[in-house]
From Swiss-Prot:
One of its GO terms (cellular component) is ribonucleoprotein complex. It is found in: Plastid, Chloroplast. This is Large ribosomal subunit protein uL23cz/uL23cy. Binds to 23S rRNA.
Amino acid sequence: MDGIKYAVFTDKSIRLLGKNQYTFNVESGSTRTEIKHWVELFFGVKVIAMNSHRLPGKGRRMGPIMGHTMHYRRMIITLQPGYSIPPLRKKRT
């Protein structure tokens, strides 16, 4: 899976798991259709909606030189009812 970097676990993304929505950081050059195809193929689920936003890079200083990290894209993927991604399911205790 070249386009998907990793799953995101923030307060908001954990709250969205209850709505059957999963959050991933993806390559900034990937398109929505590519990500949808990869998620459906790799996890064996049906995607009904996708939301995305671009997160800006941050400044990093190395001595007198000011650099920056690369920006990246975050996708919130909504699955059809009845489908889930097993390793990302929130366990209730």
